[in-house]
Amino acid sequence: MQTQERGNKMRVKCVLITMTALFTFGMLADLSYAKIDPKTAGGIWLFDEGSGDTVRDSSVNKNNGTLKGGVKWVDGKFGKALEFDGKDGNVEVPDNDTLNVAAITLVAWVKSEAKQLLDGNVIVYKKPSYILQYWSTTINPGVFVGGQWCGSGWLPQAVMWDNDWHLVALTYDGSIQKFYVDGVFKGDNAACKGKIDIAASILTIGTGNTGFYTGSIDEVAVFDVVLNEDDFKIITTKGLRDIAAVFPSGKITITWANIKAQN
């Protein structure tokens, strides 16, 4: 009986040590992402399902998407990703107010080869609000304000399209747009000022009204706040998965309940 009691106490002690370690790790993760609040995300699509026709939104908004056409699962920058055929492959996300934002950060990991490039390759698009794409010889993201297109060519494609993964990001705070690649600021544009246009429309990944994307896309996110260069450097290093997992999921409570049940 004493041996069993000692065993139970030892088991509880080991689990408490594990719980403490998990809590400490969670606190450190929280500090790392203190500036990137998951609650400010309109949608975070990690593409880590690896199979099926549904991509889950890891934000609290549940803006899940559906695969359409020529899309297949491949290895990504972090976990799994989607490869688009440039013909009819895309992801459709239903319209939701959480994707209609006043200020914005639009971010995605992309991988493509120069030989795959065509004008109007759209990475992310919500009509008539915002778009991340490349056109002609440049990366061409931007927002729509007052019915006016407020984007411009930012960076020669040859800098990026080397069949390697690159993080591209666009921000707009109501007065100026900024563009980043791999966590580094590349340029700004103050052509438009005011609120981003809003309309009831789906969000698409891999297509828009100017064409279909050819290549792979991983970890797409829309935030309703403006992130900065330090934030993008964190995402470049760690990806978006840790941001989506910052808050506890109840696993510690379940573990503690199981311990009590065993004793």
Enumerate the language-model features and the residues they cover.
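Extracellular glycan-recognition modules
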Residues: P38-G42, L46, S51-S58, K87-V145, ...
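Extracellular/periplasmic catalytic domains that process cell-envelope and extracellular macromolecules
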Residues: K35-T40, W73-K77, T98-V101, W161-D162, ...
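Extracytoplasmic low-complexity segments
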Residues: R11, I17, F23-K87, G187, ...
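Extracellular glycan-interaction patches encoded by glycine-rich segments
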Residues: P94-N96, Q148-P156, G187-A190, I198-E219
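A generic structural motif
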Residues: D48, C192-K193
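N-terminal secretory signal peptides that target proteins for export/translocation
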Residues: M1-V15
